[in-house]
Regions:
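Histone-fold recognition with a strong bias for associated Lys/Arg-rich disordered tails
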Residues: 1-178, 183
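A short gly/proline-enriched turn/hairpin at secondary-structure junctions
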Residues: 48-49, 195-201
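Amphipathic alpha-helical segments
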Residues: 178-197
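A short, structured loop/turn motif at beta-sheet edges
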Residues: 181, 209, 243-247, 271-279
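A structural signal for the main folded, soluble domain(s) of proteins
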Residues: 192, 196, 204-205, 265
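Glycine-rich portal/gate segments that line the openings of hydrophobic small-molecule binding cavities
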Residues: 205-261, 318-321
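Beta-strand/loop substructures that line and gate deep hydrophobic ligand-binding cavities in soluble
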Residues: 253-306
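A conserved amphipathic terminal alpha-helix motif
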Residues: 296-324
Length: 324
């Protein structure tokens, strides 16, 4: 994977998590502390480094809140900060990085750095304001400790690139979820929770169910309230629970029963406990259509790669968000 592609994917992933964290505090501008929180949640080795130091998302959030209160007190402002709310990033607009935070992302691909989350974390450890050093002090460690652990990391491996088989396109990725494996398994195996992680499912009819198949419906609006336009034959979805093996495996199959123009989509989840939560490996396969549509689809490999990555990214981010 090129440095540019790795940086683009890392930047997208960290930006989403950071701005979600900022939205909990009613902010529209993500700063260094939100970038740090995003790194704690990262599925890349940088996140593992922080979590192995005992830095969970709950502890990191408390440290950020304490630091904000200390900063206000140093200015002579004696006030109680409002409690953070739920994540509302997807329902609102107007988010951006503060310049010093975006500069960290840019510098992570320069001077021999590879654009990974580990590179971002390394740059963040040397930011000059002292904010991150103070957060780490509250969390019982130092920038030097973090850098020492980063120095021991193996080079990052490629991931998320789709493989084209005879009848499908298959993509895979991993995500970190800050919750116990049993809780994550229950979430993924529950048909009522499918709309919380599947972008193509807005609701599920749980009535008259045989227990392994349900009818779902595509979303009619986006989280921000804007309507979604979709042809009638693509409204309904058939959801099949293909496999459940507690507590480490769940597989779903989605089809469109009212049209032959859309192939089946199978999404498999493999769960494993890890420090601070659960690692979820996600594999999605898109069934290929036959005939002239299949021939026309052959040149669209870059588009297929992007579709695979963005779909896997959305699913992984949604699962993590459900437990934050």
């Amino acid at each position: 994977m090129s440095t540019f592609v790795r940086l683009a994917q890392t930047s997208q992933t960290l930006s989403l998590a950071a701005m979600e964290e900022a939205s909990r505090q009613g902010l529209r501008q993500a700063d260094l502390e939100h970038l740090f929180l995003a790194l704690v949640l990262s599925d890349q080795p940088a996140g593992e480094v922080l979590r192995e130091l005992g830095i969970t998302i709950d502890r990191a959030r408390r440290a950020v809140d304490e630091q904000h209160a200390t900063q206000l007190a140093s200015l002579g402002i004696d006030t109680t900060l409002p409690e953070p709310g739920r994540i509302v990033f997807h329902e609102t607009a107007g988010y951006e990085w503060r310049r010093r935070a975006s500069d960290v992302l840019v510098r992570a691909s320069r001077r021999g750095l590879d654009g990974s989350a580990a590179a971002v974390l390394r740059v963040l450890m040397s930011e000059p304001s002292g904010l991150i050093a103070e957060l780490l002090r509250r969390l019982g460690t130092t920038p030097a400790d973090v850098v020492d652990r980063l120095d021991r990391l193996a080079p990052p491996a490629d991931g998320g690139r789709p493989v084209r088989g005879n009848e499908s396109i298959v993509g895979s990725s991993e995500t970190f979820v800050p919750a116990p494996i049993e809780d994550v398994w229950e979430f993924l195996a529950d048909p009522a929770r499918v709309p919380d992680w599947a972008p193509s499912i807005g609701s599920v009819d749980l009535a008259d169910s045989a227990g392994t198949a349900w009818i779902g419906y595509a979303p009619t609006s986006r989280p921000d309230g804007k309507p979604v336009r979709l042809r009638a034959e693509f409204r309904r979805r058939r959801l099949e629970l293909l496999e459940t093996r507690r507590p480490d495996r769940v597989a779903w199959r989605f089809t469109s029963p009212d049209t032959a123009k859309s192939g089946p989509i199978v999404t498999e989840f493999a769960l494993a406990p890890t420090t601070g939560g659960t690692r979820v490996a996600i594999t999605t396969s898109w069934g290929r259509r036959h005939g002239w549509r299949r021939v026309l689809g052959l040149p669209l490999r870059p588009a297929a790669r992007f579709l695979a990555w963005i779909t896997l990214f959305q699913i992984g981010a949604a699962i993590s968000r459900a437990f934050r």
